[in-house]
Amino acid sequence: MMSFNLILILIIFLILIQNYVIDGNDNFNLIKCPDEIPNLKKWSNYKSWKKLKLPIKGESINITTPILMDIKPPDLDVIRIFDKGMLVWKHINNLELRVKAILIYDGGQLIIGSEQCKFKYKATITLIGDSIYTEINQTINGNEYGQKVIGIDNGGTIELHSEVTKTTWTKLISTISPSTFNSNKNILTLLDNVNDWPIGSEILITSTDYDMEQSETNFIVKCSTCKTNQIKLKNPIKYLHWGSITKGVDERAEVALLTRNIKIQGQVGKTCVNNKLVCDFFPFDSFGAHIMIRKGFVNAHFFGIELFNVGQSHVVSRYPIHFHLCDRVDELGGYENPAYIKHCSVHKSFSRCYVVHSTDGLLIHDNIGFDSIGHCYMLCDGIEMDNVFSHNLGAVTRYGLLFPHDRSCDMCSRIQPNDFNGNPTQCTECNAVSTFWISNPWNTLIDNVASGSDSTGIWYLFSDYPSGLSHERGIKYNIKPYLIPVKKFYNNNVHSCTNGIQIDGGVKLTPPSKTQPQQLNSMINARYKPRSNPKNPNSKPSPSIFNGATIYKNKWRGCWARGGFLFMKNFKIADNAIGFTFASEGTIPGDQNVGQYIYKSLIVGESDNIGQQSNNIPIVNGRTNPYGENGLMPIRGFEIYDGTISLDSMVFSEFKSLPPLFRNSSAIGFLRFNDWQSSSETTIKNIKYINVDKEIHFEQSLMDGDKISTLRDLDGSTTKLSNSILVRNLLFYSTNNCYYKKPWDALICKEDTRQIYICNDDTNSTNYLSLSSSVVAIRDNIENQKIEQIGLPNHSPRNRFQFLVFKNHHYDFHFPNHPTPPILRVQPMNWKQSEKFTFGICIGISKGINLKVLKTVNGTYGNSNFVEELYPTFSMNLISESTYYFNEITSMLYIMYYQYNSKDHLNYCPEYGCEELVIKISGKNSGRVTGDCQSLAYGSSFTLFDEVVNRKFENSFQMDKSIIHNSEYAYRGNAYLPYHPTSKSQIQFKCNHCIPSVGIKYFEIWVNGNRNSNQRISIQLFYSINSNQLKSQPFAIDKNYFKKNSWVLVRILFENLKNLLPENHIHLISSFDGLSIINSLELNQPSLFLDNIKFIYDN
């Protein structure tokens, strides 16, 4: 049996071993500190060197044995550490190594301190070199490392461990201002204990306003009266820095310690030594140092390192700390002690801060990146996964030159002025530089801060496959970032950027071409569709959860999130032009059966942090305001767009319209100038408003998407009417179940909203009479209850028209600018099983056409397995889901839609596809007549000519030739009028006070160009005052697209004709004596034909 004493000795021995291990260096695991390793040869001893003399200035040396750095050597060329070579720093103060490059590989090690023995003195490595033109590009085993580099290749080890303070960065707890903070009162009070922050250290105080340049540095001086959470500054401050939680949002400035014991820096000159393009944008020396680690390294740990004057603005892969193509660097990659970057500080970087390139499992914790060019914390290609970014601070991220997504718009147009097709490069291809660039969602972001970026704080992007050097590997292993859920996003903070958080877009993976002319690596549209199996787009959707974010003082938008199954919770947002916007698709969400949710969040319009004017950010209404429109751009807390969206358990606070400008400020609004769809299923509930003047705001803009803006208030917490819907204040929506809410300029209705798309499936055969297209919808056969849509901008000419409609109402659709398309598809959205509605389509002509109506699924009218043909009936009352009715008098086609299949609540269509109706129009008269039946279907009219001249005008009717009778050519019947526009010719319809001056809405005339031409004709009204016969000024018909064999409707507001009378005559006229049709030009014009001339009464 082993004696007790022997057991005790073994225990003590094991404890000693634990205390003497050096990371990854099994040969010396009984040594407490690296500089105590046996057999270390002192640099200062000439016997340590093969040449038996110390290295001299400008010499390159190979280190193949353990060397102890115990003196400051002269400036050296290249140090190669390999075989069993080690370069270990002696634990003494102020050692500096100045060298052009350090290359570590094949068993080589660079060691300053260890995990058990942090380096507590000042140590500096300065990488020297004058310019890109004079320095040699270094290589290891054929791998390029560039210039001014510490390179770690296969078999290499780098261990840099500095003694650090308890707190790397913290926050202010009281506001400081230049007016009250000076050399006599220059103490910062901070959130955490900072009594170990060294005197003389440099600190950063971040901006708490819209201008990131309000971030500023200072130095700590001795303070005998400071508490443990206070420091005294050397210099006065320049800007106001907020130091409290305001209205529930933490807007306190971050205060960070930039100085570390171990410093790696680049030697830089006073001027730019580079090509003209680089120097134009960066008129200073941007040729900094960099560290690159490649696959196969033994160990790589960076703990408490300061990196200054690092990165190279002109070359890819020359970044301060760069894990390059390393694969896994954690336990799964075979590392007992996984790689990490902790408590480091990068400042004054000419290219990025911390870069993870085709590397998985890296820990980046409690670091600082300040004043950097290009993305700061970066996942390069979109193949990087399982990396952890925790408690990092990034501040002042500037535009860079390397890739389009780094560049400003100006940089983009300078570097690549035109795309593949010769068109100017679009700014949207660029302008995406971000403090955190997250190109693959399967990574962790916890407790990070992005404080200031020229563009964006945190950007999640979703390319189809990884880009760059990882592209082929990504395809091989079927890695699709756009299908990958977010691994973890928790409690991140973004402020003082242009945009806070961006969740959208991707990088172009292919070279430019005719069909995709954008440059390689430019920003493109992409759709995020997270899946339970990210390798299979057909697997079930999987939610991506963003839990906790503080977002404030961003010039434009707090957060923009486009994608499928997105959950946002515990957000706190304040002082942004737009707090939060969800987006999905402009037509139908690409990710069906899912929605977007935000809940348990706070959005504040304007906090107590009023800011300080600087850098073209003016003071408006007593506070900084960067938003534009002379300070009047509306504030929107939550901006509704696309959908389907759900807001639940939200608090909106401090949305006030204050004097003297009374700027529009609303808790909830809609995307302005919107061309795209809005889901009829978007809902809000459990909403609380605190100090809010306007809960909802509808903009004045009336683009297609603006007109269909809507949401449903499920519980009445906003409208005081549960299960009500909000829509724009338009007659089209105003039913007996609606009431007007004046402060919102909105209608609140007890109606059920649905959507209908009218789609032109044959634009090639459509007889477009101009470049414009539109569809008019009319509700319940009342002509003034109409809305006109010009179509979604995803096709030219526009071919898809969206309408928001109410269940249990009737809708007709007309085509006022051209004949009804020969193939028309009606696509109902968000209808439920067994629901039905009847609608009308204007065909425009009743003779010489053939109609065919089909019920299809997803437009598959060419596939008989999914087609059901409808058949005509002879009465409106006999319409069913299997029949249609065509009214030959009005040329209106009436069809019933019946939804056979059920749909999930969030799906726009049933699971088996959208049930649609397809109308096919053929025959010799197809495409001959404008598809506008409004006058025939709803209006009462005063006709001047239709087959015959109205008897009121028979005695005075004048024209140069007689009426033509030709049923094959006439608009509707058998007769029409010819007109030969010469300098003196005209057609007159004269009567005696037969046309009332009130009660008429339109003048209409149908025109056939006889041949394709640009004929110009005008209309004049006759009237009399005191027996004097007078004429109005001519009203020129501005339609210049009359075509041969096409009848075009010209509809003129009667008010526009009357307004051409002399102003002093208008109020004297109670009736008119007729009108004339005249030539608008002095020269003779080709003949044209006229038909169905009438006035339409205002019903």
From Swiss-Prot:
SMART domains for this protein: G8
Signal peptide range in chain numbering: 1-24
Record-linked InterPro entries: CEMIP/CEMIP2, CEMIP_beta-hel_dom, CEMIP_X, G8_domain
Superkingdom in the source lineage: Eukaryota
Domain G8 span(s) in chain numbering: 47-174
GO MF annotation list: hydrolase activity, acting on glycosyl bonds
Keyword Signal appears in the UniProt entry: yes
PROSITE patterns, per the entry: G8
Pfam families from the UniProt entry: CEMIP_beta-hel, CEMIP_X, G8
Keywords: Glycoprotein, Glycosidase, Hydrolase, Signal
Keyword Magnesium: no
Sites carrying sugar chains: 62, 137, 664, 764, 858
Family: Belongs to the CEMIP family.
Protein name from the UniProt record: Protein DDB_G0287365
Organism annotation: Dictyostelium discoideum
